[in-house]
């Protein structure tokens, strides 16, 4: 997940730069990279069971996994990202992400994989899910699968860096809004709704 990792590091760098200019966020932001996803979400599972900070203090989890490629559905149009889970626990998280997109990125936010009936079940297959199981609102940003998915042929020269930057901008502004709101977002959706 080089594209997701790089994007997270870019968002962290932007947050640190804002803080250095005296414009830091109201809330702390924990940037975390975990491993073991393909073996059963092991890194995130370990963290939620052994957190460095009390989980009740977590406002949201933002998961960035594979955001630099283009899937078959969007061949010729890299201006999209699949958004999964933002509305599963908090309607506010969903609205914040959409508002950030409208203002800063103008991407197509595709909710295909957010559908409970989607056979891929991506919502349950990436690291945000361990946080969601603990009642922490989560959103997963994803570019979809491609011919090199889980292959050694998935190499850096195939990354669309302009697309990745736009997604990173969306993620930064979503995170920044979450970290600077007067009140925490509310968990207002129950499982199965």
Q: Where do the language-model regions lie?
A:
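Soluble non-cytosolic domains of exported or imported proteins
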Residues: 2-6, 23, 38-42, 87-91, ...
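Metal-dependent peptidase/peptidase-like ectodomains
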Residues: 34-140
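Surface-exposed patches in mature extracellular/periplasmic domains of secreted proteins
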Residues: 18-24, 107-115, 181-190
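Active/binding-pocket-proximal capping segment
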Residues: 4, 25-30, 64-66, 100-103, ...
């Amino acid at each position: 997940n080089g594209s997701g990792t790089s994007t997270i590091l870019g968002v962290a760098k932007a947050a640190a730069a804002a803080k250095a200019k005296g414009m830091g966020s109201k809330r702390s932001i924990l940037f975390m990279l975990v491993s073991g996803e393909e073996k059963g979400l092991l890194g995130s599972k370990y963290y939620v069971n052994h957190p460095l900070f009390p989980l009740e203090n977590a406002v949201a989890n933002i998961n960035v996994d594979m955001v630099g490629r283009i899937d078959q559905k969007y061949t010729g149009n890299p201006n999209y990202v699949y958004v999964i889970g933002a509305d599963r626990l908090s309607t506010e998280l969903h609205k914040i992400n959409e508002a950030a997109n409208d203002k800063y990125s103008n991407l197509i936010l595709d909710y295909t994989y957010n559908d409970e009936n989607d056979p891929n079940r991506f919502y349950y297959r990436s690291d945000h899910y361990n946080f969601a199981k603990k009642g922490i609102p989560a959103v997963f940003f994803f570019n979809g699968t491609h011919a090199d998915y889980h292959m050694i042929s998935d190499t850096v020269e195939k990354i669309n860096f302009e697309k990745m930057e736009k997604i990173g901008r969306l993620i930064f502004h979503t995170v920044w809004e979450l970290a600077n709101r007067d009140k925490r977002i509310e968990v207002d959706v129950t499982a199965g709704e």
